[in-house]
């Protein structure tokens, strides 16, 4: 009996030695064990708000996009399906308010551009019907205000401006608009428009080089005046100067398994949140300061269940809450920060 306990103790000490040796000396010995020991610790930044929304039965289609009007505390959701409302409106507390369906064919991206003076909702429509291949501005109640593109007709033209499966947009408080045009369409381009819809600069062409794209799927801005584009097909994020359009660099090292499908910054500007569709994963990447973007560094992840498929996400610029449109789970989920944010910039 004594010999048995001596053997147990010896085995325990030997296992402890292997673990410490692997930790401090980089030994590959543990790789052959049937269990995995991870020495990487991640910051836990967010938790799921299991009570949002209050009544999920209002999700009657496939939820592709979500945006937040942080001025008025409203959440807009775009869903697809036959004979259903395409746009749902909830409060940030999760209560359903209303729905509308006017002149919306197939929503892909959505953005709430709200100031103290105007509240509007922009939608990229990739439908093949009369309302498709457009970027449209609505009032908060669904009244059509502005149409960019040639409704129902895809194209590459700039005068008049045409789109082919415009994926998403970002609207600055100044009114300037950034559009990623090419969710599998002809264009693969990033366009900046002035508030009166004149083209200020653009980058576009299918390819793998700098300022070329393969499915530019999401776009956002940071407080340093940089434009960040999820170049999904090329498995990278490209960065540009918002004023000149100059290419500033790319992150290639963090997305080798799956390209990024959505990008948004936390309100304090510390982290870029990246959704990866087919991995069903959200990653929190350290945001670089002014200057070189360097290499990306993931400091936290949220691994969702298989086939949840997070498509596009949005961040409430006041509270820091993250809303994720999941096309696999056909729902939008809300994640809240463990620590309160102090609003700093409109991302």
UniProtKB/Swiss-Prot annotation:
Its main location: secreted. Keywords: Glycoprotein, Repeat, Secreted, Signal. InterPro entries: 6-blade_b-propeller_TolB-like (IPR011042), NHL_repeat (IPR001258). Gene3D superfamilies: TolB, C-terminal domain. Glycans are attached at residues 32, 101, 206, 278. Pfam families: NHL. Residues 1-25 form the signal peptide. One of its GO terms (cellular component) is extracellular region. This is NHL repeat-containing protein 3. It comes from Pongo abelii (Sumatran orangutan).
